[in-house]
Regions:
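Short capping segments at the starts of secondary-structure elements
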Residues: 43-47
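N-terminal leader segment of winged-helix/HTH proteins
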Residues: 1-27
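Charged, amphipathic alpha-helical coiled-coil/dimerization segments
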Residues: 17, 67-127
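Residue-level detection of the helix-turn-helix DNA-binding "recognition helix"
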Residues: 25, 41, 56, 67, ...
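Short alpha-helical "packing" element that flanks the helix-turn-helix/winged-helix DNA-binding module
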Residues: 36-37
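Short helix-coil-helix linker/hinge
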Residues: 27-33, 61, 92, 118
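Residues within helix-turn-helix
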Residues: 48-49, 60, 67, 87
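The alpha-helix within a helix-turn-helix
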Residues: 52
Length: 136
């Protein structure tokens, strides 16, 4: 039976959630906290609003996770020197350790998923997914 794109994306998402929740439990993180850490690590100094906009996630949800991560000592919040209303987010040393573990686990998962695909197929897949996500 052929599946449509939504079914395939759903299958991949649920599979990834199961995988992620397994290794995140050992790190003491929730999935949503790991998403915030990953985005700060990839773009230090990003704001809460920047993460919310990038991921199409509610600002309040990001704010809750930022508060938890700050309380847990994984991130620092610094006010922008030019605009005190802007709060930039940075990983602490412990936050960087968690980021590296998350990134390594994600890299391993992608390597497993990409087995049997050619570099051209992988490139095409990533290009098409980026184009679709840009339309949202």
């Amino acid at each position: 039976m052929d599946r449509n794109i939504f079914q395939n994306v759903g299958i991949l998402y649920r599979s990834y959630l199961n995988y992620a929740n397994s290794f995140l439990k050992d790190l003491g993180l929730s999935f949503s906290e790991s998403v915030v850490i990953s985005n700060i690590g990839a773009s230090e100094g990003i704001t809460q609003e920047g993460i919310a906009s990038l991921l199409c996630i509610d600002k309040a949800a990001i704010a809750r996770n930022v508060k938890l991560l700050e309380t847990g000592g994984l991130i620092e919040i610094k006010k922008n020197a030019d605009d005190k209303r802007l709060k930039k987010l940075y990983l602490t040393q412990e936050g960087w350790e968690k980021y590296k573990a998350i990134t390594a686990a994600n890299t391993d998962r992608l390597a497993d998923l990409y087995k049997g695909l050619t570099p051209s197929e992988i490139s095409t897949l990533e290009t098409v997914l980026n184009k679709l996500a840009d339309k949202v």
